[in-house]
């Protein structure tokens, strides 16, 4: 598993609304500027994607990645991992979703990557954190308006 960076925010929306947006992975391109397209290959018995391919553009990183999603800890946690990609050799991530009981939700997004080409660790972490913070901000904007 790749070493992970993470960020946490509180969203002014009930957990069910936050989960509805996060679990609708096919719609990510409509609110996440880093995700350009999503193609679902496999779903579980509840219709949730378990294997999909995304086209991602995060800063200087442009890649196509096939990911596996693990829904066994949903709705509180949804981890994903890389099956294959063009440039990345590893990508692990997860969303932690905590219902605060007051129509707010705390979301933590963690992400770790490794690339096929040599990249200084500091630069890799900077791109990870930029991607995480941008995704969290765009999720918050989508839900809070």
Task: Label the predicted regions.
Residues 1-47:
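Hydrophobic ligand-binding cavity/cleft-lining segments
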Residues 29, 39-86, 134-145:
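Glycine-rich portal/gate segments that line the openings of hydrophobic small-molecule binding cavities
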Residues 18-21, 28, 52, 69, ...:
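Hydrophobic pocket/interface hotspot
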Residues 11, 56, 71, 111-113:
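Hydrophobic beta-strand positions in extracellular immunoglobulin-like domains
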Residues 2-4, 55, 99-100:
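Extended beta-strand/beta-hairpin segments
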Residues 81-134:
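Beta-strand/loop substructures that line and gate deep hydrophobic ligand-binding cavities in soluble
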């Amino acid at each position: 598993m790749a070493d992970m960076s993470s960020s946490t925010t509180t969203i002014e929306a009930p957990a069910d609304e936050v989960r509805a947006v996060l679990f609708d992975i096919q719609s990510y391109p409509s609110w996440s500027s880093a995700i350009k397209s999503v193609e679902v290959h496999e779903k579980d018995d509840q219709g949730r994607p378990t294997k999909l391919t995304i086209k991602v553009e995060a800063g200087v990183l442009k890649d196509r990645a096939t990911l596996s999603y693990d829904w066994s800890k949903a709705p509180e946690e949804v981890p994903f991992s890389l099956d294959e990609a063009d440039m990345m050799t590893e990508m692990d991530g997860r969303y932690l979703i905590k219902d605060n009981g007051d129509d707010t939700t705390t979301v933590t997004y963690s992400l770790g990557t490794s690339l096929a080409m040599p990249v200084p660790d500091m630069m890799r972490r900077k791109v990870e954190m930029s991607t995480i913070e941008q995704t969290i901000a765009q999720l918050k904007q989508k839900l809070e308006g």
